[in-house]
């Protein structure tokens, strides 16, 4: 599809499923190229299935890079036959269909769905979502020295810190490329000149070359060279005077100066050079200039002549030209000045400008460093904090010692470098999926208890109990936890026994709020005129519990004070029910298991 802009139909009447799949993949590719050609986003969701969506995006992105698709060729995508539309989607049961649970990329391995992210993103801890990778902080960018890294969503870009300067242009790869003014026609050479490109500039070379003894000026005119003014190579020998002519020069003998005189530079007359060493007629700060028959004193560069004191005084360039000589700081010196920079900057090669120092290149921070203009900033990873002492060292945060540390873990918090861990008691509990709470292990459900076949397993917080009971004499078992009294047959002692004994199991932690109702007792069906009395007849030696009536025919057992430590209690509660002039007794055996609080 990328090369031919159309899809070939499967050949033969018995075209294989593979050929049919290839053609369907081809149509998905053409849809991606069509989206790019029509200016649509390559991330557009067509609800065509995960595999087709991946091919759609890949061909759309590639078409953006090549830009060679003719929209008219996309008409072929409309020619999918009804037979193809009726074929069963081979990826109907694909859990990645439509993207599945993943935010970006999804792959169904058969055993599980694996999510992944596009380049420039990283998978979050939920295993589904993706977040942008900050390549500028992680150091995974490719920016060169002199370039700043700027993070973008899914990628980054490099930006040159300084401009290229006159005569250069910035390329797409942040390089400085010389501008050929001659080729681009932006030079200012006159018609009599030929433009010749140089690095960062150009020069105009005259088309007409001058003869020996002449030099061309800026307008390509030939100007006579005064050979006699050459200081490097004097054309005439000592004792002769040089006389310039058009295109050349001549020489003649010089006069013979008397004692105490010297021939001047022109060789025309004799003069005394009062400025010649070791004589210093002008004094400190002056420059002596010889003249015919005399001399004059001038101030050196960096000094000016004070008409009042008649002396050369130092020029304070920093005050005379404020902010124009130096980029940061200007310090005056005798006859000159010196530029310096603020902290975090260094002096450029021109001796005047200041450029930022990248302090991060020397790794001053213990973890992360970010260079800023004129300084730098240290950062710490999650679980660490910057030291208040030096501002560069990252110290571990003891999450367990924070004011909220007691609420981080339900049982015990253990600090580790950069994070913390929660733990549970050695037995009876396991750590919840959130990594903070402790969940009770129901040994009775999981089958890890050691109760015998004649015992009943009862789960409590952090453990379990094996319970078994037998009905006392003159009673028979009527339910799993209930005993009924046998007929008494005129036996008075027997008639005083409770009609029913029922066993109950209760469990609560030591930190339960008191007072608290833990058990309610009354007849299963009340009759008008019923009344009752409730009393604890055993197991309350320490006075943790009490009874009270809440209605004429029902009462409750309440906890009056917290049980200070884990323990097992057996409480016997007796209810006397008065009905139609007779009294019937009922007993409740309460197995109470007090567990430790987390």
Curated annotation (Swiss-Prot):
Compartment list: Secreted, Extracellular space, Extracellular matrix
Anaphylatoxin-like domain ranges (all copies): 1-27, 28-60
Glycan attachment residues as annotated in the record: 14, 450, 454
InterPro entries for this protein: Anaphylatoxin/fibulin, cEGF, ECM_structural_protein, EGF-like_Ca-bd_dom, EGF-like_dom, EGF-type_Asp/Asn_hydroxyl_site, EGF_Ca-bd_CS, Fibulin-1
Residue segments, region Self-association and FN1-binding: 271-355
Keywords, sorted A to Z: Calcium, Disulfide bond, EGF-like domain, Extracellular matrix, Glycoprotein, Repeat, Secreted
EGF-like domain ranges (all copies): 92-131, 132-177, 178-223, 224-270, 271-313, 314-355, 356-395, 396-439, 440-484
Annotated GO MF terms: calcium ion binding; peptidase activator activity
GO biological process, one term: extracellular matrix organization
Gene3D superfamilies for the chain: Laminin
GO cellular component, one term: extracellular matrix
Disulphides: 1-25, 7-26, 28-52, 29-59, 42-60, 96-106, 102-115, 117-130, 136-149, 143-158, 164-176, 182-195, 189-204, 210-222, 228-242, 257-270, 275-288, 282-297, 299-312, 318-330, 326-339, 341-354, 360-369, 365-378, 380-394, 400-413, 409-422, 424-438, 444-457, 451-466, 471-483
Entry function: Incorporated into fibronectin-containing matrix fibers. May play a role in cell adhesion and migration along protein fibers within the extracellular matrix (ECM). Could be important for certain developmental processes and contribute to the supramolecular organization of ECM architecture, in particular to those of basement membranes. May serve to anchor the mature/soluble form of DTR to its fibers as it migrates through the extracellular matrix. The direct physical association with DTR may be useful in such tissue developmental processes as wound healing.
UniProt subunit comment: Homomultimerizes and interacts with various extracellular matrix components. Interacts with FBLN7. Interacts with the mature/soluble form of DTR. Interacts with CCN3.
Family recorded in the similarity comment: Belongs to the fibulin family.
The protein's name: Fibulin-1
């Amino acid at each position: 599809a990328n090369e031919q802009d159309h899809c070939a139909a499967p050949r033969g009447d018995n075209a294989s499923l593979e050929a049919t799949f290839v053609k369907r993949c081809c149509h998905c590719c053409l849809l991606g190229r069509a989206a790019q050609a029509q200016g649509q986003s390559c991330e557009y969701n067509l609800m065509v299935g995960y595999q087709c969506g991946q091919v759609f995006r890949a061909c759309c992105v590639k078409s953006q890079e090549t830009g060679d698709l003719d929209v008219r060729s996309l008409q072929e995508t409309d020619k999918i036959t009804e037979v193809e539309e009726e074929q069963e989607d081979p990826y109907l049961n694909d859990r990645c269909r439509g993207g599945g649970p993943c935010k970006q990329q999804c792959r169904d391995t058969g055993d599980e769905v694996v999510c992944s992210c596009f380049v420039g993103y990283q998978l979050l801890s939920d295993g589904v979502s993706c977040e942008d990778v900050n390549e500028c902080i992680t150091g995974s960018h490719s920016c060169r020295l002199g370039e700043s890294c700027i993070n973008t969503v899914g990628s980054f870009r490099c930006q040159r810190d300084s401009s290229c300067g006159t005569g250069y242009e910035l390329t797409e790869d942040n390089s400085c490329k010389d501008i050929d003014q001659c080729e681009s026609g932006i030079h200012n050479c006159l018609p009599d000149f030929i433009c010749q490109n140089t690095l960062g500039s150009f020069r105009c070379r005259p088309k007409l070359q001058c003869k020996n003894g002449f030099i061309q000026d800026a307008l390509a005119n030939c100007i006579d060279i005064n050979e006699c003014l050459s200081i490097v190579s004097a054309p005439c020998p000592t004792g002769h005077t040089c006389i310039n002519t058009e295109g050349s020069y001549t020489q003649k003998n010089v006069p013979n100066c008397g004692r105490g005189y010297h021939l001047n530079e022109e060789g025309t007359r004799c003069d005394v050079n009062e400025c010649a060493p070791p004589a210093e007629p002008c004094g400190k700060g002056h420059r002596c200039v010889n003249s015919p028959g005399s001399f004059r004193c001038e101030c050196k560069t960096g000094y000016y002549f004070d008409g009042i004191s008649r002396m050369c005084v130092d020029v304070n360039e920093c005050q005379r030209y404020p902010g124009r000589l130096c980029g940061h700081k200007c310090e005056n010196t005798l006859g000159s000045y010196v530029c310096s920079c603020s902290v975090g900057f260094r002096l450029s090669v021109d001796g005047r400008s200041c450029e930022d120092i990248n302090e991060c290149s020397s790794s001053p921070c213990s973890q992360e460093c970010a260079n800023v203009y004129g300084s730098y900033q240290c950062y710490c990873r999650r679980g660490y904090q910057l030291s208040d002492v030096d501002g560069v060292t990252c110290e571990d945060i003891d999450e367990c010692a924070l004011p909220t540390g007691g609420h981080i873990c339900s049982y015990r918090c253990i600090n580790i470098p950069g994070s913390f861990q929660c733990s549970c008691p050695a037995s009876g509990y396991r750590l919840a999926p959130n990594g903070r709470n402790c969940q009770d292990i129901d040994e009775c459900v999981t089958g890890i208890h050691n109760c015998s076949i004649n015992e009943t397993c009862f789960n409590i917080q952090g453990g379990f109990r094996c319970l078994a009971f037998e009905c006392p004499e003159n009673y028979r078992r009527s339910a799993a936890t209930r005993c009924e009294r046998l007929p008494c047959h005129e036996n008075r002692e027997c008639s005083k026994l409770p009609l029913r004994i029922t066993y109950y199991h209760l469990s609560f932690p030591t930190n339960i709020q008191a007072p608290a109702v833990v058990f309610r007792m009354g007849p299963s069906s009340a009759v008008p005129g019923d009344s009752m009395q409730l009393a604890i007849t055993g197991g309350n030696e320490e006075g943790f519990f009490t009874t009270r009536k809440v209605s004429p025919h029902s009462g409750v057992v309440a906890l009056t004070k917290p049980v200070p430590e884990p323990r097992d209690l057996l409480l016997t509660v007796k209810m006397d029910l008065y009905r139609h002039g007779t009294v019937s007794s009922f007993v409740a055996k309460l197995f109470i298991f007090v567990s430790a609080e987390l």
